[in-house]
């Protein structure tokens, strides 16, 4: 049994399970089984599931339960366009002051982690992507945009992990380029 006390820690573990497609054969997240797995009551499980629903990783269906939101090839381009639009909106709403050095150091730290990770391993790739999401979302001061960014970026993470299976070098290079670009942009803005 994996002990996790907070709903945030439970949500993090479930995000990893969803993104890495592990241990969820039927596409459902069952409250009772999750409560047993994490050694908690159903209250923190419900809170974690509520957060995942807010991020559009799952859908809570009356009489059915919590269902993982599927990735549909026909909606992939829409998912990407939505993420781009949210990123552009966040940039337009960014405050005029320079990025605090702590944010720059966070991105540089993630870049350093890439050098010691095996990015062709889905778990390592997921960890780097999840850290990048957290770092970028923390920079977005508008809470509505930050939440929208998180939902859209989790979707992109799921797509990129699918692509990792067939094109690991391309995905790793793209991730490194993204992080380097973010670091350069932040360095010139500080």
Where in this protein do the model-derived segments appear?
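Conserved amphipathic alpha-helical segments that form helical-bundle/coiled-coil interaction surfaces
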Residues: 100-163, 175, 190
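Generic hydrophobic alpha-helical segments
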Residues: 14, 113-114, 177-182
């Amino acid at each position: 049994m994996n002990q996790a006390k907070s709903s945030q820690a439970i949500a993090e573990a479930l995000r990893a399970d969803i993104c890495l497609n592990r241990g969820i054969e039927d596409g459902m997240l069952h409250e009772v089984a999750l409560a047993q797995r994490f050694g908690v009551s159903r209250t923190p499980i419900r809170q974690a599931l509520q957060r995942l629903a807010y991020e559009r990783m799952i859908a809570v269906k009356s009489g059915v339960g919590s269902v993982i939101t599927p990735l549909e090839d026909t909606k992939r381009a829409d998912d990407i366009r939505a993420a781009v639009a949210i990123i552009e909106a966040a940039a337009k709403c960014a405050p005029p002051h320079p990025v605090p050095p702590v944010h720059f150091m966070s991105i540089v730290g993630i870049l350093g982690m890439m050098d010691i990770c095996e990015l062709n391993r889905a778990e390592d790739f997921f960890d780097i992507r999840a850290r990048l999401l957290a770092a970028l979302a923390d920079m977005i001061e508008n809470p509505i945009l930050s939440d929208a960014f998180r939902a859209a970026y989790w979707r992109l993470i799921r797509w990129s992990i699918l692509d990792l299976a067939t094109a690991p070098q391309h995905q790793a290079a793209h991730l490194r380029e993204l992080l380097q670009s973010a670091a350069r942009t932040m360095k010139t803005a500080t």
